[in-house]
């Protein structure tokens, strides 16, 4: 099967200040004061809200306004492009009654497409990496979409990645179509025709800076192009998370890695991203971005998502040098609904080191301040990469006390974990074959805890996590073992009297 590149050269002929646009224009005509024919008509016309408390606390003099895209009916900025791509496909005769829409996505485009598919009567299959939140999955299921998960660690062009899996499905399913947000001109055009115009009118033509996260690049490219046409002096600021390569700086190309913030950043350059329209790139990190999102919620009452925090952090970094008479607009792409079990949860933030743990021994438990080294647990054997097949791994897991296998490339440091549930799911869904090496089903994101941590801290982490990986902080984070709630319970019941255990 020929792989369709999501980063192939763009054929767009748009030029700044051209007399005529080469594209079909779709303006927004919905009237919110009247009855609407369906929910899709309600997409767009999101409010522009002034930030007050946060700029004041940071000593920012310029005005900062937030475009609240999370107030779209599907909960994100991606509602706009989903509807636009469907409209364009229908007009071209590519999407007809009975068709199935397939889309590789980080979730929000999928939700927008599933919502539109529900209204229009199409079937919908969404292919998304496992990193994405359970809340997005639940929303997609509620809208009637089918969902296929792919390994987060898979590189964008690998057969296991969401793009390849979607293309494979499209070949197998009759009357199916991939609208392909990475290359579809309707992605940036939705923002060129509507979002940018809304911002311009809301600001009454007075806007000096636009700050937005870059994912597929459609949002910032479409808005940026239109605003540059309307006012050439506007500065377009793009936000790229550390671990992504969208920022064209030389360092960024060697920084490909995992990051928690969803919906922005990629390990390839999507076709629809026009980096020429961007004046400055700001790199952001998970810690600052997710805490900034919590700050937007707590201090401004804006129920936004994690990538909104990245936009805020980028804005604050440049706003400190911007004079009082200037005006900045930031895009808040999605909302809190998608992340209730992620950055909204203090447990989740603590276990990833983004918040200082709150470990108070309120019940005066005798074991609370004891070290992990007091626990009795077996160190799992470390398996070499590319030595065990999925079939062999399933057999090993079924016959072992542990439900986990540990992969290492040097027999000292852990590279990833294999769980029976995950491996079985991958085999059943066809993501991996029984004859594949088990590394393809390896999980690289897990909670790591230092050997010097207390049992109280571990017990708090294990309230939400099924297990934690213990590393030796005195010996270059060498793998020590895996601890779950059973190990702590076993220690308590073995070393404390039954009365003491019950009372404390």
Swiss-Prot record:
Keyword Ribosomal protein applies: no
Modified residues (N6-(pyridoxal phosphate)lysine): 78
Pathway: Amino-acid biosynthesis; L-cysteine biosynthesis; L-cysteine from L-homocysteine and L-serine: step 1/2
Annotated ranges, domain CBS: 375-434, 442-498
InterPro entries with a match to the protein in the record: CBS_dom_sf (IPR046342), Cys_Synth/Cystath_Beta-Synth (IPR050214), Cysta_beta_synth (IPR005857), P-phosphate_BS (IPR001216), TrpB-like_PALP (IPR001926), TrpB-like_PALP_sf (IPR036052)
Residues involved in pyridoxal 5'-phosphate binding: 108, 215-219, 307
GO cellular component: cytoplasm
Swiss-Prot/TrEMBL cofactor(s): pyridoxal 5'-phosphate
Assigned EC number: 4.2.1.22
Keywords for the protein's UniProt record, in alphabetical order: Amino-acid biosynthesis, CBS domain, Cysteine biosynthesis, Heme, Iron, Isopeptide bond, Lyase, Metal-binding, Pyridoxal phosphate
PROSITE patterns recorded: CYS_SYNTHASE
Assembly with partners or alone: Homodimer.
Protein name as annotated: Cystathionine beta-synthase
Species whose genome carries this gene: Apis mellifera (Honeybee)
Underlying gene: CBS
């Amino acid at each position: 099967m020929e792989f369709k590149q999501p980063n192939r050269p763009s054929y767009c002929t748009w030029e700044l200040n051209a007399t005529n646009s080469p594209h079909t224009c779709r303006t927004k005509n919905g009237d919110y004061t009247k009855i609407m024919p369906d929910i899709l008509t309600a997409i767009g016309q999101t409010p522009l809200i002034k930030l007050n408390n946060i700029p004041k606390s940071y000593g920012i003099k310029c005005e900062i306004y937030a475009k609240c895209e999370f107030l779209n009916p599907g909960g994100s900025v991606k509602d706009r492009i989903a509807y636009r791509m469907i409209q364009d496909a229908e007009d071209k005769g590519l999407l007809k009654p009975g068709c199935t829409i397939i889309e590789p996505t980080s979730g929000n485009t999928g939700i927008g497409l599933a919502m539109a598919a529900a209204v229009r009567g199409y079937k919908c299959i969404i292919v998304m990496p496992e990193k994405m939140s359970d809340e997005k999955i639940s929303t997609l299921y509620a809208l009637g979409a089918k969902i296929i998960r792919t390994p987060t660690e898979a590189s964008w062009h690998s057969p296991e990645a969401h793009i390849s899996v979607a293309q494979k499905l499209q070949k197998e399913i009759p009357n199916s179509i991939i609208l392909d947000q990475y290359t579809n001109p309707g992605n940036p055009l939705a923002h060129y025709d509507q979002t940018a115009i809304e911002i311009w009118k809301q600001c009454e033509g007075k806007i000096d800076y636009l700050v937005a996260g870059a994912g597929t690049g459609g949002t910032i490219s479409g808005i940026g192009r239109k605003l540059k046409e309307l006012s050439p002096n506007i500065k377009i600021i793009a936000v790229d998370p550390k671990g992504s390569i969208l920022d064209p700086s030389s360092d960024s190309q060697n920084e490909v890695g995992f990051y928690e913030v969803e919906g922005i950043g990629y390990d390839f350059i999507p076709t629809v991203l026009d980096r020429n329209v961007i004046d400055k790139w700001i790199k952001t990190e998970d810690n600052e971005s997710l805490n900034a999102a919590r700050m937007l919620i707590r201090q401004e009452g804006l129920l936004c998502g994690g990538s909104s925090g990245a936009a805020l952090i980028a804005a604050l970094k440049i706003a400190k040098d911007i004079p009082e008479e200037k005006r900045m607009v930031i895009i808040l792409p999605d909302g809190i609904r998608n992340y209730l079990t992620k950055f909204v949860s203090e447990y989740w933030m603590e276990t990833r080191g983004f918040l200082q743990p709150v470990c108070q021994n309120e019940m005066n438990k005798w074991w609370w301040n004891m070290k992990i080294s007091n626990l009795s647990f077996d160190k799992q054997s470390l398996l070499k990469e590319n030595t065990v097949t999925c079939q062999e791994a399933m057999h090993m897991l079924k016959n072992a006390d542990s439900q986990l296998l540990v992969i290492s490339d040097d027999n000292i440091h852990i590279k990833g974990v294999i769980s029976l549930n995950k491996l079985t799911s991958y085999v059943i869904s066809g993501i991996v074959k029984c004859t594949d090496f088990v590394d393809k089903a390896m999980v690289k994101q897990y909670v790591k805890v230092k050997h010097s941590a207390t049992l109280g801290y571990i017990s708090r982490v294990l309230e939400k996590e099924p297990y934690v990986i213990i590393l030796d902080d005195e010996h270059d984070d060498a793998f020590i073992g895996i601890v779950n709630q059973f190990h702590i319970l076993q220690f308590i019941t073995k070393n404390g009297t039954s009365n003491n255990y019950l009372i404390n």
